[in-house]
């Protein structure tokens, strides 16, 4: 009896262990339940299938790439057996290739849109001036006293596309634009002190190179004055270069010319609206005057009476005159 009980106990334990092992095998092999096996990405793959579908803008681009990707999309909605699996080479390499080709194209599209927004024409506002003793006067005047009385004539020129170079001045500080090699503050003082200690007649001081004067400080007879910083430039090209690459000098007149163009554009739009309103008022006035003239004439016609209704002492109708003549003739005869 004891041996039988032991055998039954052992058989029950063996059956339990067999059931646990079967459940583990079912979990480790999902092909028997119809769930497709998850494929780990290879070494050369760029991204997984989820990243691939997030990058592609439309599913039509996915279909014509390869037959393996079409099979993958077609069979993903249906449970498949281990025999119907798509080969790993087709199912894994095609999404990675498409992901690597679609993501950079998306980035290039966005950058091209930003460049198109930045690359716009721009108006530069300047004034042609003459220089007399280092003072800029108006172009048309001969004396400085007359230039103060006359209003300066401002002109404009349009820069070609691609005006702005680099980042806008609001996002860039002047200190960051300066070179790191340039000494600042105390370093300049320490460098200048040993040079100043040398006697004035020494050859070291004589051989020291002099700084080149900038072009805008050179005396000139006439030029073009920037309306933002009032600097005079010899040629129109130098003025355009100043507005275009002014950030290199530590400041820029770019914002001034943009706001000036906006203000002038708004003023022109307001003036055109006022002119249109005045034109409509002028066209409506003669119509109203004609209508007023027609109204009293109609009233006068209504107020007139025929000859028969008028009193005889004032007006005589032609019929009454004939009757009187006939009556006089009959009485005379």
UniProtKB/Swiss-Prot annotation:
Zinc fingers classed as C2H2-type: ranges: 224-248
Tissue expression remark: Testis-specific.
InterPro entries membership: Spt46-like (IPR040879)
Family note: Belongs to the FAM170 family.
Basic and acidic residues bias locations: 10-29, 143-156, 185-196, 282-293
Region (Disordered): 1-45, 73-107, 143-214, 267-333
PANTHER family listed in its UniProt record: PROTEIN FAM170A, PROTEIN FAM170B-RELATED
GO terms of biological process kind: positive regulation of DNA-templated transcription; transcription by RNA polymerase II
Biological role stated in the UniProt entry: Acts as a nuclear transcription factor that positively regulates the expression of heat shock genes. Binds to heat shock promoter elements (HSE).
Keywords linked to the UniProt accession: Activator, DNA-binding, Metal-binding, Nucleus, Phosphoprotein, Transcription, Transcription regulation, Zinc, Zinc-finger
Name of this protein: Protein FAM170A
Domain of life: Eukaryota
Biased composition range(s): Acidic residues: 271-281
Compositionally skewed regions (Low complexity) per UniProt: 92-105
Primary site of residence: nucleus
Entry comment, domain topic: The N-terminus is necessary for nuclear localization. The C-terminus is necessary for transcriptional activity.
Organism: Mus musculus
